[in-house]
Amino acid sequence: MLVLLNFNILRLRYKELDTTIQVIYIILSIMSKEKIYIEYPLKGSASMIWRYIGTSAGLSPWFADRVENIDRTFTFYWGKSEKRVAHLVAQRNGVYVKFRWEDESQSTYFEMRISYNELTREHTLEITDFAEKGEIEDQKDLWDSQIENLRRQSGM
């Protein structure tokens, strides 16, 4: 009986340790990511830009090879094997969409927001994203490539 009691205490402590390790991992992953903000001027109306960022049909020609949407869950496919799931966490029609990758921390997201500059009379697509400290330039390059795809697909 004493051995069984000691084993149960050890098992509880192991679970506590396991939970503690998971919490530390989450905190470290949050701390290691930095916010990225990029602006891209686009030659198109807000409604045209919105069609490309606010719907799965609009996202599929430029952001991913295929995009499926069920309720607030978007599944993005690249090539034959890469797939990622994101949840739509906020949206204001005609203004912005904000997604959180399913496999990322709750505090990270990526957002696409449409703004208008009165001086230049151009719309801008503002991107907010998060990346590991050593991968910031790679992430920016990826967004540059994605926006170039958007411009080619849409004529913006």
What are these regions (language model features)?
Residues N6-I9, Y14-V67:
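Hydrophobic ligand-binding cavity/cleft-lining segments
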